């Protein structure tokens, strides 16, 4: 998998920028706030249709413009593809693949695969459960694009069910509304079933991907830590289940919904489901979130990212792109060397940095170095 060209039009701080990538490794060099990370964000959008920096398309578009665009040419084992994302404010984004307009995001996902690693990824360890769920979901979408649709279905059901629970709480405090309350309870049972069906699809897939990721991450972690640390990763589903069978998992959902029925009605919101899942990391039996040093946390995140690379490569049959956003400065020489050694000759890699002294001479000689200044890119 190789990104040959990238064109940014009214995207972030770029008015018009064409970039041709002629090496497997590209170093984007420049001071802060010049636009280095914006290039990586454009690639991330092509791979996942999401950004870890914002959820609003308006934020991607150059100030004063109403339309922005990212276009790219990708080379894969099965041939070359042209990708384009057109962003509008106001309006909805449009996607094209080989100049054909796509009606569904699902048809675009999987065209390009990429793993992003930035200093923000330390939130995987020390951040909220939401950060870990987003990480899992982003990985799953790349491994199995249909998962984006499955996740969307679940959150649609969740929103509808929450709206009904909110109404139920209000109805329960009003007199003379017993018939209305009865009708709402009947409706709630229908949404219970929908929540169990869609939620079981989400939790089963999350459990499977964690199961595949664990041994890969443990091997990398052991190598990087010099065999001094043992990493354990546990998926903590909000609804516990034993056998990976659709009906059994759905029954576990319905049982927990019944168990939490009163609490949900009092709170007016859904407290059962994968929107409350978490992942726990422990190092030598100690929770990494609370007690891990910054060095240990960085080792853990690096091991996870290397495991992601390997897993995507195993599943799709091609190495994904690797996006390293100002991360080398965050790593000590040992971790830097581990990372650079893995990359060498295998993954097309894009690295942002403010200086070049982290790289050895051989690395610099085999890399394309681009200078980024105020939304303009040119060779060094």
From Swiss-Prot:
Q: What positions does the entry give for ATP binding? A: 30-37
Pfam families tied to this protein: SMC_N
A Gene Ontology BP annotation from the UniProt entry: double-strand break repair
Gene Ontology, cellular component aspect: cytoplasm
Keywords, alphabetical = ATP-binding, Cytoplasm, DNA damage, DNA repair, DNA replication, DNA-binding, Nucleotide-binding, SOS response
Taxonomically, the superkingdom here is Bacteria
Q: Which InterPro entries match?
A: DNA-binding_RecF, DNA-binding_RecF_CS, P-loop_NTPase, RecF/RecN/SMC_N, RecF_2
PROSITE patterns named among the record's database cross-references: RECF_1 (PS00617), RECF_2 (PS00618)
- Predominant subcellular localization, coarse grouping: cytoplasm
GO terms, molecular function: ATP binding; single-stranded DNA binding
Subcellular compartments: Cytoplasm
The record's annotation in HAMAP family points to: RecF
**Alphabetical list of PANTHER family matching this protein:** DNA REPLICATION AND REPAIR PROTEIN RECF
Q: State the similarity comment.
A: Belongs to the RecF family.
Which purpose does this protein serve, as stated in its record?
The RecF protein is involved in DNA metabolism; it is required for DNA replication and normal SOS inducibility. RecF binds preferentially to single-stranded, linear DNA. It also seems to bind ATP.
Among NCBIfam families, the record links this protein to: recf
Q: What is this protein called?
A: DNA replication and repair protein RecF
């Amino acid at each position: 998998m190789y990104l040959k060209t990238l064109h940014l039009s009214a995207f972030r701080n770029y008015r018009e920028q064409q970039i041709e990538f002629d090496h497997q490794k590209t170093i984007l060099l420049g001071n802060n706030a010049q636009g280095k990370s914006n290039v990586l964000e454009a690639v991330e959008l092509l791979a996942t249709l999401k950004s870890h920096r914002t959820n609003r398309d308006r934020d991607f578009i150059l100030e004063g413009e109403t339309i922005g665009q990212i276009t790219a040419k990708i080379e894969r084992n099965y041939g070359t593809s042209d990708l384009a994302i057109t962003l509008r404010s106001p309006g909805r984004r449009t996607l094209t693949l080989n100049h054909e307009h796509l009606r569904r995001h699902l048809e675009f996902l999987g065209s390009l695969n990429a793993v992003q690693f930035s200093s923000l990824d330390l939130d995987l360890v020390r951040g909220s459960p939401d950060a870990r769920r987003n990480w899992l979901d982003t990985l799953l979408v790349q491994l199995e694009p249909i998962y984006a649709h499955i996740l969307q279905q679940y959150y649609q059901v969740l929103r509808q069910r929450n709206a009904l629970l909110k109404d139920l709480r209000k109805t329960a405090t009003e007199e003379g509304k017993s018939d209305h309350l009865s009708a709402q309870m009947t409706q709630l049972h229908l949404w219970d079933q929908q929540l169990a069906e869609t939620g079981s699809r989400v939790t089963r897939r999350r459990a499977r991907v964690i199961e595949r990721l664990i041994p890969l991450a443990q091997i990398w972690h052991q190598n990087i830590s010099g065999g001094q640390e043992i990493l354990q990763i546990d998926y903590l589903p909000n609804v516990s289940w034993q056998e990976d069978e659709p009906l059994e998992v759905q029954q576990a959902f319905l049982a927990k919904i019944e168990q939490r029925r009163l609490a949900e009605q009092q709170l007016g919101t859904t407290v059962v489901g994968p929107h409350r899942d978490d992942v726990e990391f422990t190092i030598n039996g100690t929770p990494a979130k609370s007690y891990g040093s910054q060095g240990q946390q960085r080792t853990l995140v690096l091991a996870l990212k290397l495991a992601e690379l390997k897993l995507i490569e195993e599943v799709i049959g091609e190495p994904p792109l690797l996006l390293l956003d100002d991360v080398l400065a965050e790593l000590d020489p040992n971790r830097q060397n581990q990372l650079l050694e893995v990359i060498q000759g295998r993954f097309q890699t894009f690295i942002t940095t403010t200086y070049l002294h982290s790289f050895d001479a051989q690395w610099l000689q085999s890399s394309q170095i681009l200078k980024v200044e105020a939304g303009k890119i040119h060779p060094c």
